[in-house]
């Protein structure tokens, strides 16, 4: 609610100390972690704003400095990542070399594309991809590729349709930046945009980003032109983090192969 021209305050998680806030034109959403002091102390910090309290069933509680979920620390997952990534890198090495040569022959510039993405805990890392566009974009104005995007090269369209451009991320897996399965990492500009509009967005940082994920095998692959599409992807990411198991990882990997045979959302 709004009173006397002040924005309303929505306590998303009844806890303290305050973790972070997100704002919109008419609401301040307050996130918090563990209840370590009386709720009245937390509300005292908001004394200049009218306050509405309400439960949230969507928020996956963030625990700064606390234990990470199993998906982030299970040794079996890391062993599977390293062994599988090493084997796949050796298997696809000839294909990657041919793709890199085709990229260099078609357009000037490097064969590899590097971009900052958010990893485990939101820590930045440099993601690796085969370059599929004529120009390199980064920063606050980075734009997602659209169907018929004239920035994408002819070779790039082939690589993107079969997700071959993502194969260099096997090196990210070997380095520990990523996992075979997990939430797909987004450009930092997109992280900033969607985290301001989706309160539970940051929960996806509780797992290493993946080459593939539950959202992708559910058909949520490709661009996210609307906030609602991103909400669906985030819901799948949180579902994966909360219900992770090694067996589920294996099933997602197996389901990824047939999902690559359709190019409906690959452009």
UniProtKB/Swiss-Prot annotation:
Taxonomic source organism: Caulobacter vibrioides (strain ATCC 19089 / CIP 103742 / CB 15)
Keyword Ligase: no
GO cellular component: plasma membrane
Reactions catalysed, as given in the entry: di-trans,octa-cis-undecaprenyl phosphate + UDP-alpha-D-glucose = alpha-D-glucosyl di-trans,octa-cis-undecaprenyl diphosphate + UMP
Enzyme class, broadest EC rank: transferase
Transmembrane domains' residue ranges: 83-103
Domain of life of the native organism: Bacteria
GO biological process, one term: colanic acid biosynthetic process
Localization annotation: Cell membrane
GO molecular function: glycosyltransferase activity; undecaprenyl-phosphate glucose phosphotransferase activity
Pfam families in UniProt: Bac_transf
Additional free-text comment from the UniProt record: Complements colanic acid (CA) synthesis in the E.coli mutant lacking wcaJ. Can also partially complement the O-antigen defect in the S.typhimurium wbaP deletion strain.
Role, per record: Is likely the initiating enzyme for holdfast polysaccharide synthesis. Catalyzes the transfer of the glucose-1-phosphate moiety from UDP-Glc onto the carrier lipid undecaprenyl phosphate (C55-P), forming a phosphoanhydride bond yielding to glucosyl-pyrophosphoryl-undecaprenol (Glc-PP-C55). Also possesses a weak galactose-1-P transferase activity.
Membrane topology: Single-pass membrane protein
Family: Belongs to the bacterial sugar transferase family.
Keyword Membrane included in the entry's annotation: yes
EC number: 2.7.8.31
Protein name according to UniProt: UDP-glucose:undecaprenyl-phosphate glucose-1-phosphate transferase
Keyword annotations from UniProtKB, A to Z: Cell membrane, Exopolysaccharide synthesis, Glycosyltransferase, Membrane, Transferase, Transmembrane, Transmembrane helix
């Amino acid at each position: 609610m709004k009173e006397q021209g002040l924005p309303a305050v929505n306590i998303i998680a009844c806890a303290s100390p305050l973790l972070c806030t997100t704002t919109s034109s008419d609401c301040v959403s307050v996130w918090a972690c563990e209840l370590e002091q009386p709720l009245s102390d937390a509300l005292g910090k908001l004394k200049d704003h009218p306050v509405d309290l309400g439960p949230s069933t969507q928020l996956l509680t963030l625990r700064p400095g606390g234990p990470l979920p199993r998906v982030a620390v299970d040794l079996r997952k890391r062993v599977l990542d390293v062994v599988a990534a090493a084997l796949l890198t050796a298997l696809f090495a000839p294909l990657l070399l041919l793709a890199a040569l085709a990229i260099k022959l078609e357009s000037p510039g490097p064969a590899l594309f590097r971009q900052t993405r958010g990893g485990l805990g939101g820590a930045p890392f440099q993601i690796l991809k085969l370059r599929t566009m004529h120009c390199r974009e980064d920063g606050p104005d980075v734009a997602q590729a659209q169907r018929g995007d004239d920035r994408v090269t002819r070779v790039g369209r082939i690589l993107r349709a079969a997700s071959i451009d993502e194969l260099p991320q096997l090196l990210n897996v070997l380095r520990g930046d990523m996992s075979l399965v997990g939430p797909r990492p987004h450009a930092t500009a997109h992280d900033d945009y969607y985290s301001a509009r989706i309160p539970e967005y940051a929960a996806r940082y509780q797992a290493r980003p993946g080459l593939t994920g539950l959202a992708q095998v559910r058909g949520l692959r490709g661009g996210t032109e609307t906030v609602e599409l991103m909400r669906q992807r985030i819901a799948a990411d949180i579902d994966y983090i909360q219900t992770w198991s090694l067996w589920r990882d294996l099933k997602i990997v197996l389901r990824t192969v047939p999902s690559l045979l359709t190019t409906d959302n690959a452009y």
